[in-house]
Amino acid sequence: MKDRIPIFSVAKNRVEMVERIELSDDEWREILDPEAFRVARKAGTEPPFTGKYHDLHDDGIYRCICCGTDLFDSETKFDSGTGWPSFYDVVSEHNIKLREDRSLGMVRCEVLCARCDAHLGHVFDDGPRPTGKRYCMNSAALKFIPRDQIG
């Protein structure tokens, strides 16, 4: 039996217990395009200013490209000047996991999807109020859903 974890659903406006998603690399390759696989499953980073969401200002929700978990609301998106979509908050702390990342000779805080462990990006303590956080995400790890299509 797969582990069940609490995940917040924006459409239902509540936390539900859902099964964790655990697939092999071959199974993820069948689902994702090559760039999404490289970024989300292999902790890659897209070049700045190249992702499809870094300059998107539409109203909606950003979900995990791998499993569809709600992650960020466009209301918390801001222009960080970095070239990656940046948010000052998550839709729910239930929906992400944080872990120390010591790659590239730096110590950073990696952000992962709580349901499927997809690499989303990193969080920094240089964001705007009210949180002071900057969730610096890869567009390739996200899927945007316009607010009127959330369901």
UniProtKB/Swiss-Prot annotation:
Reactions catalysed: L-methionyl-[protein] + [thioredoxin]-disulfide + H2O = L-methionyl-(R)-S-oxide-[protein] + [thioredoxin]-dithiol
Keyword Zinc: yes
Cofactor: Zn(2+)
Domain MsrB span(s) in chain numbering: 25-147
UniProt cross-references to Pfam families, sorted A to Z: SelR
EC number: 1.8.4.12
UniProt cofactor note: Binds 1 zinc ion per subunit. The zinc ion is important for the structural integrity of the protein.
Family the entry assigns: Belongs to the MsrB Met sulfoxide reductase family.
HAMAP family named among the record's database cross-references: MsrB (MF_01400)
Official protein name in the record: Peptide methionine sulfoxide reductase MsrB
